[in-house]
Amino acid sequence: MSVDAALKALAEPRRREILRLVWSQERPATEIADHFREVSRSAISQHLGVLKEAGLVFERRDGTRRLYRADRDEMKKLRAFLDDYWTTGLERLRDVAEAAQRKKETK
């Protein structure tokens, strides 16, 4: 999974909604498309392709149907990447706050 591709894929609200739909269970493309009545099936197919290319969903064929489910392992990697940024940022903030407190106490 490319973090850049995953973040770009998740920047689109419909793709995030698709990911929510396939998070807990595998769903056929037709069922996913039915959830978005205001969007064409080809647009949903393109969204699914972007999510698949980004490594966020698996596609499985069952006869003529295409079934999709979230790739939770890849999502864990993305979360770890984001957690690292969050943790690093919080650690820096803590260090600055502690330095300011020490400076205040020595005055």
Where are these regions (language model features)?
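Amphipathic alpha-helical dimerization/coiled-coil segments
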Residues: 1-2, 20, 24, 75-107
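Short, hydrophobic-biased segments on the C-terminal half of alpha helices
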Residues: 48-49
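Alpha-helical interaction segments
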Residues: 57-59, 74-77
